[in-house]
Each structure stands twice: as C-alpha cells, then as structure tokens.
C-alpha cells in the first residue's frame, strides 16, 4: 500500500469531535449545568411537516413496483435542480437547471470539488474558517495561504494584489464569525479572481440567515462572477435538516478556467 502521507499533517482530531468530547466531560462533572453550544451549527427544532411528509412519500414510493427506482440521475433529481434554479430568481440570478448539481451536503462537496483542480495548487483561506476547508486541502497536498481577519477589517479581508492563488474560499455569512460581505466587497474579490485566473469557491451555507435586502445571498448577484466562481450551499441550514445530507453546487457554463 502507498499511503497518502498528507494525512499525517492533519490535527490529531476533528475540531467538532474535540468540542463534543470536552462538552461531554464537562457535563458529566457538572450535571446541574446548562451549556450554550457554540460549536457545530446544528438545528434545535424538529423537521418541518412538509419535509417529513415528503420523506414518507419517498420511502413509500420505494415499496411499490410502479414507483420504485434505483439510482437517481447522476446530477440529481431534475425537478429538484429546476426548483433550485427557480429559487435563485428571487435574487435576480438566472441559472439553468443543468448548472445545478445536487450533492450529499456542503461539507462533502467543499472537499470533493477540489478534484476538479488537480493537485499541487495554491489555495487561499480566510481565517477563522470552517475546518473542512483546511483539512480537505491538507489531504489534497495543496499549498494553503491563510488570510487573517479581525476587528481591523471587520472580519472581511479584501484582496491583496501581492498575493495570488488558484482557488479562493469565501464564506458569507462567514462561519464562524457571522461577518457578511456586501456587494462592493464581493465585486473586489470577483474582479481580482478574474484578473489572476483564480476560482472563487463561495460557501453560501448560511445565506438564508441574511435579513438585509442590500446584502447578496449569492456570489452570482455580482457582475462577472459566473466566469470565476462556483457556489456551494447546504439545505441543512436553508431548510433546517442537518443529518439528512442534502446540498447543491452551482457551476455556471461561463466558468472559463
């Protein structure tokens, strides 16, 4: 066997597992305490009725010869892809259903998408960041440029013309800070990516939490983004069913890398 030695560069344990272990230990020794859980972004309410009813119908369909099916289409259910494309119309973003790819969730896709770029790439990650970004790129053997953020830039770093990368991760609203890029700030990143032939991986998992009308939910609300960006979203957050594993990725036909 030829091992992937990049695994040895990972931290000893996954961040959320480490937090869960510390939480369990604390509650065992302080049984009367209540902890506000600020770790993994899990839900606190049961699935809504519409989701539960749809799951039941789907299971029942598998028990009848007339409605049973095996594998779904490779890129996802056509009706779901069309519905997702229609969802973007609310933000005046025009997508074709064939530009939408249904996945088993954003966490998996944020790592799997790297297979499109080959190996030995330079990747830019804004810190603090969702742990999956770093772990996936360590495993892939990519070079990582960590872009710091803090009070001085509102946790929203902007492009540095002296630095270049092949792939740039942007999460807005950010996990874990909650900071959100406005249109002008995202336009700077889009123009920068187009200038240096980079691809923006836009993590829109928390887009449904945006309340301000003038804040973009999608990178594709920004002019020029379709030639440089891929967007990944999670129904765990949008529809509130973590653990059900459903998300999607948008890759525009205009992407020219």
Role assignments for model-derived ranges:
Residues 204:
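Walker B catalytic acidic pair
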Residues 36-38, 124, 145, 201, ...:
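Hydrophobic/aromatic beta-strand patches that form the interior of the parallel beta-sheet core
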Residues 2-104, 112:
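N-terminal small-domain helix-loop-helix segment of the aminotransferase-like
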Residues 66-191, 207-222, 226, 230:
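Conserved core of the PLP fold type I
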Residues 215, 221-257:
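Active-site PLP attachment segment
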Residues 172, 200-201:
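Residue-level marker for buried hydrophobic side chains located in beta-strands
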Residues 30, 140, 195-196:
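Helix C-cap/helix->beta junction micro-motif
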